[in-house]
Amino acid sequence: MQKEKILVIDDEASIRRILETRLSIIGYDVISAADGEEALSIFKREHPNLVVLDLMMPKLDGYGVCQELRKESDVPIIMLTALSDVSDRITGLELGADDYIVKPFSPKELEARIRSVLRRVDKASSNNNLPNSGIINIGFLKIDVNKHQVYKNNERVRLTGMEFSLLELLISKAGQPFSRATILQEVWGYTAERQVDTRVVDVHISRLRAKLEDDPSNPDLILTARGTGYLFQRLNDSIV
């Protein structure tokens, strides 16, 4: 069985060495880059399964790397940030990152986040509330659950793995609101003990709306349940 490949991008050599060693021990194939330009070159050559991305780097920072990766790939991205300003982390998420960890961090915590993200992205849908055939038509959307593909007005919409998992959760119980805490647990695998900014959910909802709604500022599909969280509006849908 081929090992999953992880690209670690960080300008601190000590962090690269620690992560290369730890992640290799638990079974990953690890490659690394010291700056953003080198990272993009390695990415195109190696096609990793997941990227661990530091935000503050020379030549091309993490924001620029994230933007470039999202132009061509839906690869899972976990940000590493020493920035205390929440707005900086939110910017990274808005550019397409799937998750973040604040420095200094425990390598075990990062290992857990990597396993959780890869498990969520790689696994086939196992939600019993979704049809076995895997095709759901909702208004102008066609959702292929098994292939993790979404079409809007018959045109393919590219979603990251986490975006699709979030959509999959919402449509599994259309019309029922999900709290942010529930979404964090079901999609990201966070337990109640881990303190995390719930705006991770808000940013991913905004990204989904931007891709799926005709008017993201006035959504018809993914609605805000005031005081609760979010829900997928029940429409005249069909299952194939």
From Swiss-Prot:
Stated role: Probable promoter-specific protein mediating the interaction between DNA and RNA polymerase.
Domain annotation Response regulatory: ranges: 5-118
Protein name as catalogued: Probable transcriptional regulator ycf27
NCBIfam families tied to this protein: ResRegRpaBCyano
Gene: ycf27
Highest taxon listed in the record's lineage: Eukaryota
Primary location: plastid
GO molecular function annotation: phosphorelay response regulator activity; transcription cis-regulatory region binding
Signal peptide: none
CC terms in the record's Gene Ontology section: chloroplast; cytosol; protein-DNA complex
Coiled coil: none
Species of provenance: Porphyridium aerugineum
